[in-house]
Amino acid sequence: MLEVKFYDSVDDSLLKFAVIISQSNGKWVFCKHKERDTYEVPGGHREADENILETAKRELQEETGAIKFDIKPVCVYSVTGKTRVNDTGEESFGGLYFAEISEFAKELHSEMEKVVLMDELPDNWTYPLIQPKLIEKYLQIERQTYSKIQLAAKQTIEYIKKVIKPEINLLEIRKLCEEKMLELGADSFWYWNVGAFVFAGDETTISVSDKSGLRD
């Protein structure tokens, strides 16, 4: 039986793999190997001259054909038990990443037959005892992060309501908001487009405005 664990960090020398959970236009990105009828999240072994982020970027590009993407670390995972890539069964460690892909190459030049964009997670996994747990962990962390942003956003709005004055312009308000959000430990936030500022679904209107999305 395989055991999957998660860590905030481990010694870099222990990281032997990188797995990259990916989405594109709101859909999950999965790969189908030429020799298998199952689907998998892109990932692979770390090469001798790479840091683990370089491994993640290379594997993502090779296996999905990603040309333009944003990638960020999620956490460290480990697997204990024998697998096709670990015949000793000892605990092995990897870096878990998330990537948002905005552009793909027209052709793949790897062992992958094709890349599939899915609305839902697949039923036929290549690594059914590992990769579903990695995605579950990613979603859990995202929910926790979003809740943190929501709380920081509400506190920021209350702060702005207290300090705002008629002579303050939008750029000054934005600067105050960014400083307060950073002070509260939020590294992402909703921002505004000429006239209103929007945080995690809450809006304080200064004048008619459109909503904008999340910004890193």
Each language-model region and where it sits:
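Acidic, metal-coordinating catalytic segment for phosphate/diphosphate chemistry
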Residues: 1-19
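Short glycine-rich loop/turn motifs
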Residues: 17-19, 28, 193-196
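Conserved hydrophobic "DFG−1" position in protein kinase catalytic cores
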Residues: 20-22, 30, 99, 200
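Conserved Nudix-box catalytic region and its N-terminal flanking loop in Nudix hydrolases
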Residues: 23-62
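Unchanged
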Residues: 46-70, 77-133
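Glycine-rich, aromatic-bearing surface loops/beta-hairpins
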Residues: 136-139
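Active-site neighborhoods and metal-handling regions in enzymes and metal-associated proteins
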Residues: 142-216
